[in-house]
Amino acid sequence: MLRVSIAFIATIFLFSGCADKVATPLTHNLDKKEGIYSIKQAKSINMQELVNQVEHYPVIFVGDHHNTEKTHKFFAEFINELGKKGYNLNLANEWFTPSQDELLKEYTDNKFNTETFKKKVDRDKFSKYKREYVSSLYEAIKNNSGRLYGMNISKEDRAKISLREFDKMSQEEKYFYDNLDLNVTAHKQLIYPYLKHCDKMPQTTLESCFDRMYRVQVTWDTYMAQNTSKIANKVIKTPKDKLLVFAGALHIEQNLGIPLRFSRLSNLPFISISNEKIENDKDLKIDTNKADFAYIYESVEERSK
């Protein structure tokens, strides 16, 4: 009887102890060195190894750190190395909308140069980020006989959804709005910490700032995923065809933004690449679910500290 009692108490202690433990995120703890890290393999790799490892993936999601020169140079080099392997390259970019596809085709068809392209696009109306960084990507695609595609929603259409201006929406836009999935809890956990600025903003509508801004994030991800699927159906025909999807890292990481919604529309295999910035005052830790690969870089500002 005593043995049974002891065993019973031990069992209770064991399971209650497990219940009290809080799971901590799993990370790869690394030395602060620039380079490419394969999260899938838990090891550093070089550019050629990265190119070889994406061979069987027709869709490649790339997370961008805006206004960061090094990450754009890395991606431009990646594009050029893929070109050397004879891949047919297509780049879908969040800085353009599908309505600009004809203009993008004229650019890649060499009907005008990059300077003229900048003037025609008037990208400053669409983004405040430095266009000279992303221009290297467009040039790399053009130089490798590739194609550029727009995939983002326009500011005007996004505003209708943000402000719930149903009277201004077409039937197609209303259908899009009604079918936004705002209930992916893991995605909310990822995004909400970045919406803290809502606490400081004046309440202008009955709806909370958090809810409105989160709906905008889901709108971006859903719209870009839908266009990624359309473009993929159009351009992925042979093992040599690649679709590179370039958007802000928060749209790509953890496979919870564009990739999640893309996977609901397409069975094409995909792989993801993101970035990790080295910071002087923090250990270098990469979340195991961040992406399949991470480009680790040190900014000029951090190096000078």
What are these regions (language model features)?
Residues A7-F15:
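Bacterial N-terminal signal peptides
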Residues H65-T68, F96-Q100, S154-R158, A249-I252, ...:
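Solvent-exposed loop/turn segments at secondary-structure junctions
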Residues N90-F96, S272-N275:
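Short internal beta-strands
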Residues A42-K43, M47-K84:
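Zymogen propeptides
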Residues Y57-H65, N90-L91, I141, K242-A247:
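Beta-strand elements within well-structured catalytic alpha/beta cores of enzymes
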Residues V4, C18-Y57:
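N- or domain-start disorder-to-order transition segments that initiate the globular core
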Residues L89-N90, D101-I231:
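A substrate-binding/cap region within the structured catalytic cores of diverse enzymes
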Residues A23-P25, Y138, Y223-L244, A249-K305:
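C-terminal regions of proteins
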